[in-house]
Amino acid sequence: MREELIQGLLDFLNASPTPFHATTSLAMRLEAAGYRHLDERAPWHTEAGGRYYVTRNDSSIIAFKLGKRPVVEGGIRLVGAHTDSPCLRVKPSPELQRQGYFQLGVEVYGGALLAPWFDRDLSLAGRVTYRRDGKVESQLIDFYQPIAVIPNLAIHLNREANMGWAINAQNELPPILAQLASSETADFRALLAEQLAMEHDFNPDAVLDYELSFYDTQSAAIVGLNQDFIASARLDNLLSCYAGLQALIDSSDEETCVLVCTDHEEVGSCSACGADGPFLEQVLRRVLPEGDDFVRSIQRSLLVSADNAHGVHPNYADKHDGNHGPKLNAGPVIKINSNQRYATNSETAGFFRHLCLENEVPVQSFVVRSDMACGSTIGPITASQLGVRTVDIGLPTFAMHSIRELAGSHDVDHLVKVLTAFYSSPELP
């Protein structure tokens, strides 16, 4: 069972180089589990016992199953995560021809660790919008193969490279795609048209626009002498998306359960498909009772905001509070912050800790050092948007926001187990 779960995660990570592909991957798995797609632009006809999902912008997804018990009595069990990760995105007019090389100008998306992007075999994926037979359409593309690299400057030409060299994103990050003859001119949109023809078997009249990200082609892997770790891009936060999906599929059908995986968390969530937008509330208002009963249902509900936590690094242990250093493979972490950077309170933390104890899942706590700034999640955003009680949790991770992150392989079981118990729980606090 564990091997199957881990292999499923690796396959999901490899199939999801962008939020668009992650949403497609989640939708495919939901379809296989009997969930039916709902179109936001069409009327909905849902019923108790039904399983449904809806997407927005091709990059956010909400899946839910309507339980047998009325939500005004039992509330809703929600798990939230996000589909996006820090990366390098191609600019609208990206072509650069410098010293005979074809390069693409890129913009840094989110708070990326930039140094690990150098000397990697990079590919390109995302969504392309084009004109075809007089209509505007969109498709996902993925080059799959290594097509670009950002070479480092040799240490002989940069003797201070190992002493804290600052990276200039404008000048130093454009990847090299090809070497051009003096008579050649780079045309990125023509390249995209060729890729559309190869992947989807048609020739567009014109490529109009795109949202494309570079990604590392190295596959997700189990590493360590005892296979203790998962190394992959985008563990933050596709790991939580996958765990939430598995828990939703594995849980009982008695209660109403929701999985929400939104885009744009890494840049503030303020978008039509982000957690700071109306997506979740609009979906809930279409399937829950109206008026007073809607508020009653929300107030009986609980959200588990699942997003990776900072594991205590053996080489940098002083970056953590001495009493709050989460270890990899020691269970999910309850995140707490007095300034509401996390939405956890004593009641929601206590309930999650209770679930872990009841299901023999180890559990840890995280509080940022008092002299350091604290990050945040979709937890406080969703709590303030919806008025739902929330606990912020996540699995301990090294190298968060690097091109390749590290998490504990045993923690995947821990998280799926406790989230399944949460979805199946007959009582909420």
Curated annotation (Swiss-Prot):
EC number, as in UniProt: 3.4.11.-
Keywords annotated in UniProt: Aminopeptidase, Hydrolase, Metal-binding, Metalloprotease, Protease, Zinc
GO cellular component terms, semicolon-separated: cytoplasm
InterPro entries (alphabetical): M18_aminopeptidase_2 (IPR022984), Peptidase_M18 (IPR001948), Peptidase_M18_dom2 (IPR023358)
Any GO molecular function: aminopeptidase activity
Disulfide bonds: none
BP terms from Gene Ontology: proteolysis
Binding site for Zn(2+): H82, H156, H401
Cofactor requirements of the protein: Zn(2+)
Entry's family note: Belongs to the peptidase M18 family.
Protein known as: Probable M18 family aminopeptidase 2
Species in which this protein is naturally found: Ectopseudomonas mendocina (strain ymp) (Pseudomonas mendocina)
Gene: apeB
